[in-house]
Amino acid sequence: MANLLQTLETEKLVLNNRLVFPPMATEKSNEGGKLGQGILDYYNEKSMGGYISLIIIEHSFVNEKGRASKGQLSVADDRNNEGLKELASIIHKNGSKAVMQINHAGSATTSEITGNEIVGPSQVMHLRGKEIPRELTK
């Protein structure tokens, strides 16, 4: 606890304290994972005042076939570039740094969510799953 409010420096990053906001699945993205005003408002509120040194932006899918939920944010293509720039700008303006958590849900998703056949490391149903995924070979 003694170091919580002390600066943390790495070779390429300086944090004004050691407070980190973890990624939260807000489910606030628009159709297709598009970044909307709800996400901008949410992170504006969380980063306001710069008290949190580092904000980890919620898990965002890297491929449509790996989408975890309907409201998940997308980084699967360039459609969100302008919105992501605006999001980073808001967080930085408020005095925090930003990093994004990216993911592929694999067998933890469903074809209902992705609109595609689900894939995974093996043909074993995920504990929370409803479908047996197609095993990836390469």
Where in the sequence are the language-model features?
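N-terminal capping/small domains of soluble enzymes
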Residues: 1-103, 125-127
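Non-globular sequence segments
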Residues: 89-92, 97, 103-138
